[in-house]
């Protein structure tokens, strides 16, 4: 049986490079988006992505990696609260695409 816990993120052991940390961030966001589209409305995911970029990157002048990190934090909280409130998705509740029927939507722009 494999260990379900996540590995120590890059940057904590002193052996990783900044590039590996950015790759880890991108992989983590993509994995979270793949899971989130099965539980949350695609409009919510898209708007959180757009507003994160508009506020953190455009208005505040933060770097793209910081903007992605803030998006990751917001989406993790949204998915956590969804599960905490009693998600029935694991038992076949809402299908792919969140609360709407149809195929799962594509991930937000820039995360393909």
Swiss-Prot record:
InterPro entries: Lentiviral_Vpx_assoc_factor, RetroV_VpR/X
Region spans: Binds to human NUP153: 61-80
Keywords associated with the record: AIDS, Host nucleus, Host-virus interaction, Inhibition of host innate immune response by virus, Viral immunoevasion, Virion
Extent of motif Nuclear localization signal: 65-72
Localization, UniProt: Virion; Host nucleus
Chief place where the protein resides: virion
Highest rank taxon of the organism: Viruses
GO BP annotation list: symbiont-mediated suppression of host innate immune response; viral life cycle
A GO-annotated cellular component: host cell nucleus
Gene3D superfamilies documented for this protein: 1.20.5.4730
GO molecular function, a single term: identical protein binding
Family stated for the protein in its record: Belongs to the lentivirus VPX protein family.
Role summary: Plays a role in nuclear translocation of the viral pre-integration complex (PIC), thus is required for the virus to infect non-dividing cells. Targets specific host proteins for degradation by the 26S proteasome. Acts by associating with the cellular CUL4A-DDB1 E3 ligase complex through direct interaction with host VPRPB/DCAF-1. This change in the E3 ligase substrate specificity results in the degradation of host SAMHD1. In turn, SAMHD1 depletion allows viral replication in host myeloid cells by preventing SAMHD1-mediated hydrolysis of intracellular dNTPs necessary for reverse transcription.
Quaternary structure note: Interacts with the P6 region of unprocessed GAG. Interacts with host VPRBP/DCAF1, leading to change substrate specificity of the CUL4A-DDB1 E3 ligase complex. Interacts with host NUP153.
Name used for this protein in its record: Protein Vpx
Species of the source: Human immunodeficiency virus type 2 subtype A (isolate Ghana-1)
Taxonomic placement: Viruses, Riboviria, Pararnavirae, Artverviricota, Revtraviricetes
């Amino acid at each position: 049986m494999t260990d379900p816990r996540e590995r120590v993120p890059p940057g904590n052991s002193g052996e990783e490079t900044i590039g590996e940390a950015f790759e880890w961030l991108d992989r983590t966001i993509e994995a979270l988006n793949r899971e989130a589209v099965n539980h949350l409305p695609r409009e919510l995911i898209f708007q959180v992505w757009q507003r994160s970029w508009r506020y953190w990157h455009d208005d505040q002048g933060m770097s793209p990696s910081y903007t992605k990190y803030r998006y990751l934090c917001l989406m993790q909280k949204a998915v956590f609260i969804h599960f905490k409130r009693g998600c029935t998705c694991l038992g076949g509740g809402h299908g792919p695409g969140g609360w709407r029927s149809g195929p799962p939507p594509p991930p937000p722009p820039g995360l393909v």
